[in-house]
Structures are given as structure tokens and as C-alpha cells.
Design a protein with these regions (language model features):
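An acidic/histidine-cluster motif and surrounding catalytic segment
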Residues: 1-109, 113-233
């Protein structure tokens, strides 16, 4: 059984391709499925794609906003160019659309991920979670040590996303640069975007909107390479 796996890569960016190649090389002995480069959406395509898919960006860029539908605070991300943040969302969104049509799910990576341990696909398939993060939170998310400690204190191989903040703050995977997503998870995300509008992918994919459906590997399979973000610059 070959499960689709994609690494989101900026086509004409040397650093992005170099990092993606490192990820692909690191799969030896850790990941049995072929990883294909997926051309990242670039800012110049944002308007046309948002229009094509009838999407509306519904996330603040400068000041925090209380979302009345969900009761959660939406805090702006550090982003110099708004279209880069939306383009990042669109790259994941288009892969969610593909995943929703698959039978066995999909692995989605950003170019800054790299393998550090073997991925046990059977374990992922057997989990009740629809989306499972592969990443070590350290260096990949806010309150990383709190997140890491909560995961490591569990006895389970796949741990539910821990609570590291108030319920009014979206909380999800430890960085969205490496995760396994089942068709049911993709369908749910597409519905959430339709209902609440387009948010950053790691905000809409939160435990508050997907209760009981998000998990994290206790033995992390990937970590971030520690390169500069292409979204915040």
C-alpha cells in the first residue's frame, strides 16, 4: 500500500528545494513511501485561487479579534506580506482537497521538516485520530517545552493534542510542517473552512474545532530543520 506523501516546496526557491531534498534523503530507513514535491502556492496566485475556490480570508493581520462564531481569539501571525500567509494556507488546502478523495489518507510535509525516527504507518491507521502530527514541538511551536512535557508524560503512542493555553486560543499540532491526515480529517477541515472562512492552516486545524480528532506521535518522527521561515519574511 503506497500512501501519497507530499512536501510543499517553493518551485524557484533554492533554499526551499535544498531543504525539501534533505527531507526526502532523510526518509531512508524511516519512511517507506515516496515523497513528491508539491509546488507551493505563491502570493501572485492568491487572488485567483481564492476566487476560484470561493474562499474568503477571515483572520486578522494586525490586531487580535474575538471570533463570535467560535468564541476563540484570533491573534495575528507575524507576517510581512499578507499574501504569503494566505498562500501557505492554500497549499495545505489544495492538498486537503486531494486527500478527501483518497482511501488511505496522505502525508503532508513542509520543506523544513526532516526525519529523525521511523514512521509506523500501521499505528497511524489504527488511531482514532483523523490527523496526527509527526513533529517534535521543540523549535516548532509556541510554549514548546510545555507541549513536549505533556506529550512525553503520556503512556500512549499517539497522544491527544495537549492543552497549553486557555480554551479561547486555537491549539493544534506542534507546527504543521509534518502530519498524517485521513480522508475524514480532510473532509472535516474543508467543512470548517466553508463555515468559518479561511484561517492559517495551523489555526483552523485546532482541537477546539476538531475535538478528539487531533493527535501527536509520542516518539516524534520529524523535527524542523531550523531554517528561516518563508511565510513571515
Amino acid at each position: 500500500m503506497n500512501i501519497p506523501a507530499y512536501v510543499i516546496t517553493i518551485k524557484d526557491d533554492p533554499l526551499s528545494n535544498e531543504c525539501a531534498d534533505k527531507l526526502i534523503m532523510s526518509r531512508a530507513g524511516n519512511f517507506e513511501h515516496e515523497i513528491t514535491k508539491f509546488d507551493a502556492i505563491i502570493p501572485e496566485r492568491v487572488i485567483s485561487l481564492m476566487t476560484l475556490h470561493n474562499l474568503k480570508w477571515n483572520y486578522p493581520m494586525s490586531e487580535p479579534v474575538l471570533d463570535m462564531q467560535t468564541g476563540m481569539w484570533k491573534h495575528p501571525y507575524k507576517t510581512a506580506v499578507t499574501e504569503k500567509r494566505i498562500a501557505c494556507f492554500l497549499s495545505h488546502y489544495l492538498l486537503w482537497q486531494q486527500c478527501a478523495k483518497t482511501r488511505d489518507g496522505m502525508f503532508i510535509f513542509e520543506h523544513d521538516a526532516i526525519f529523525i525516527n521511523k514512521v509506523e504507518v500501521g499505528l497511524l491507521n489504527q488511531s482514532k485520530c483523523d490527523i496526527i502530527g509527526l513533529n517534535d514541538p521543540r523549535g516548532a511551536t509556541r510554549r514548546a517545552m510545555q507541549y513536549h512535557t505533556a506529550v512525553q508524560n503520556s503512556k500512549h503512542a499517539i497522544v491527544g493534542v495537549p492543552k497549553i493555553d486557555t480554551d479561547q486560543i486555537p491549539q493544534g499540532l506542534p507546527g504543521n510542517s509534518a502530519y498524517f491526515i485521513k480522508p475524514a480529517g480532510a473532509v472535516k477541515l474543508l467543512r470548517l473552512v466553508n463555515e468559518y472562512g479561511a484561517w492559517p492552516n495551523d489555526a483552523i486545524m485546532c482541537k477546539q474545532l476538531m475535538p478528539g480528532k487531533l493527535g501527536v506521535l509520542r516518539q516524534y518522527a520529524t523535527k524542523v530543520q531550523g531554517v528561516a521561515s518563508t511565510t513571515t519574511l
